[in-house]
UniProtKB/Swiss-Prot annotation:
Its main location: cytoplasm. This is dTTP/UTP pyrophosphatase. It comes from Bartonella henselae (strain ATCC 49882 / DSM 28221 / CCUG 30454 / Houston 1). It comes from the Bacteria. HAMAP family: Maf (MF_00528). Its EC number is 3.6.1.9. It is an enzyme of class 3 (hydrolase). One of its GO terms (cellular component) is cytoplasm. CDD domains: Maf.
Length: 232
């Protein structure tokens, strides 16, 4: 059957491997998620920066928002890495692929905190988190070339110490809040704000690794061969 192939694949790592190898595509340009994948020995064949509307729906629960956005990111990447067969109209791929997408939502109760775009927004996030417990909802989604899609949700609980004005001002000055859900990075200076954490630490950073491993295994991605080099 005749297939129209997207030129996106030209000069990419996808062309450097055999058709039998499953290609891992990360639907995120987040340096934190790339670093977490590298921590478990994974280097995606492609990194695709998705551009979707992340505005919460009216009265949408933070957990549902995380799951919806992770799924939408995977489906957005699917539009690039799969193409329609002219005869059947179905989306197909000449490669075996697994698209991995994730989203992180920080919330106090049902109040969703943004990824602040200004120091004022970041200050309000820190002030709101000061001395309180909050939830970090992490959703990870896998989608393969056959259209099989699975979403896993992870919930972590984090409590901040009471933050003084000098603490918040110094953290804002560091710039570490930029691009971070809830306006902080637990793996950075804000780790000194955390007095308690329950659940997955890697989820708070940006990608729940245990659940990611489970998903990739379920999609027959040979994760362990990246550790031991064995093919069987």
């Amino acid at each position: 059957m005749e297939v129209i192939r997207k030129t996106f694949f030209k000069k990419s790592r996808l062309e450097e491997t055999s058709l039998e190898e499953i290609q891992l595509i990360l639907a995120s340009a987040s340096p934190r998620r790339l670093a977490l994948l590298a921590q478990i020995g994974l280097d995606p064949h492609q990194v695709y920066a998705t551009n979707i509307d992340e505005t919460p729906k009216l009265r949408e629960h933070p957990a549902n928002l995380a799951k919806r956005l992770a799924k939408e990111k995977a489906l957005k990447a699917q539009e690039t890495f799969l193409w329609r067969d002219q005869s059947s109209g179905e989306k197909v791929s000449a490669q075996k692929i697994v698209i991995l997408a994730a989203d992180t939502v920080v919330a106090v109760g049902r109040t969703i905190l943004p990824s602040p775009e200004s120091e004022d927004e970041a200050y309000e996030c820190l002030r709101f988190l000061s001395g309180r417990a909050h939830k970090v909802y992490g959703a990870v989604c896998a989608l393969n070339e056959c259209g099989k899609i699975t979403v896993k949700l992870v919930e972590s609980c984090v409590r901040f110490r009471r933050l003084t004005s000098p603490m918040m001002e110094a953290y804002l000055y560091s710039g570490e809040w930029q691009g971070k859900a809830g306006g902080y990075a637990i793996q950075g200076k804000a780790g000194a704000f955390v007095v308690y954490i329950a659940g997955s630490y890697s989820n708070v950073v940006g990608l729940p690794l245990a659940e990611t491993m489970d998903l990739l295994t379920a999609y027959h991605y040979p994760l362990l061969t990246h550790w031991n080099g064995k093919t069987h």
